[in-house]
């Protein structure tokens, strides 16, 4: 890790602890990882702040300016979680950030972050040179309709919603955070080093001196409840695109993957072995290499 990155990480941790985000000279909250070369923009997933992705993004810093969106759940004065009415707001935020950069950019998104990139790319294709969508969230239309019509029922009956709101989110120190997450099945393919990135970058110290998740579970739940139906967007996508699936994903199902390749034949679609929905953390070096090869092709 470079000394500049160490300084950046310390500043970002301080900013998150104080309720701020890194702004520099751009108006939409973001983090600037590096400065030099063409711009790569990154859009993070629900529940995973940008600095958790250090292992994935580090290879891009060598020859590129790397800037990551900071989505609304991490903003200062972002309002209550119910102020997020749709993921379309996240797409609008990406769309609002990019004109202040040197365009067009290469944009990478993971999960919810890929939906934000996709929405912005469909609305403003001139802002983008290429896009990479990692494990885009694709749900059946009926599911989004149910979530919109019956949010209270979804909170009570949807296993993911119950799991999110009931999870432990406060610990006495970061060793306790690591010890809590290390045995989790969802993190089984993630190395200790990358898991520590999540622990160090995904927690802040509260007013009682405890370590808590920087990305609150109330905001995380709201993002799940406001999932957007992205299927139709792929039919309108004109920007060159690479779509990535973790070969063992339980989020982007095999059935959805097959359908996606049919409705978006203009996109290049690849799978990363020995990985699932968290492929940016499970296989960061392989994924970064695949993306760089595609960018240069």
State what each model feature region is.
Residues 71-108, 147-149, 289:
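Active-site loop/oxyanion-hole signature of alpha/beta-hydrolase fold enzymes
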Residues 131-170:
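Flexible "cap/lid" loop of the alpha/beta hydrolase fold
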Residues 275-284:
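Catalytic histidine-centered segment of alpha/beta-hydrolase-like enzymes
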């Amino acid at each position: 890790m470079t000394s500049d990155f160490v300084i950046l990480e310390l500043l970002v941790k301080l900013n998150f602890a104080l309720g701020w985000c890194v702004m520099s000279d751009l108006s939409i909250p973001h983090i600037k990882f590096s400065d030099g070369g063409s711009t790569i923009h990154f859009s993070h997933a629900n529940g995973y702040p940008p600095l958790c992705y250090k292992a994935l993004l580090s290879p891009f810093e060598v020859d590129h300016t790397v800037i990551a969106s900071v989505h609304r759940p991490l903003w200062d004065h972002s309002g209550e979680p119910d102020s997020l009415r749709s993921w379309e707001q996240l797409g609008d935020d990406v769309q609002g950030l990019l004109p202040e950069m040197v365009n067009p950019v290469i944009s990478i998104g993971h999960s919810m972050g890929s939906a934000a990139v996709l929405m912005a790319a469909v609305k403003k294709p001139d802002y983008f040179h290429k896009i990479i969508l990692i494990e885009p969230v694709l749900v059946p239309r009926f599911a989004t309709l149910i979530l919109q019509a019956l949010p209270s029922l979804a909170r009570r009956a949807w296993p993911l919603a119950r799991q999110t709101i009931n999870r432990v989110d406060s610990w006495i120190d970061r060793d306790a955070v690591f010890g809590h997450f290390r045995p989790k099945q969802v993190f089984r393919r993630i190395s200790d080093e990358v898991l520590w990135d999540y622990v160090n970058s995904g927690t802040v110290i509260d007013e009682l001196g405890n370590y808590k998740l920087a990305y609150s579970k109330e905001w995380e739940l709201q993002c799940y409840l406001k999932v957007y139906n992205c299927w139709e967007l792929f039919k309108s996508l004109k920007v060159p695109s690479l779509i990535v699936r973790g070969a063992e994903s339980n989020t982007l199902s095999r059935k959805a993957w097959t359908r996606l390749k049919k409705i978006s034949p203009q996109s290049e679609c690849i799978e990363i072995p020995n990985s699932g929905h968290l492929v940016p953390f499970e296989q960061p070096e392989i994924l970064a290499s695949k993306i760089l090869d595609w960018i240069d092709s």
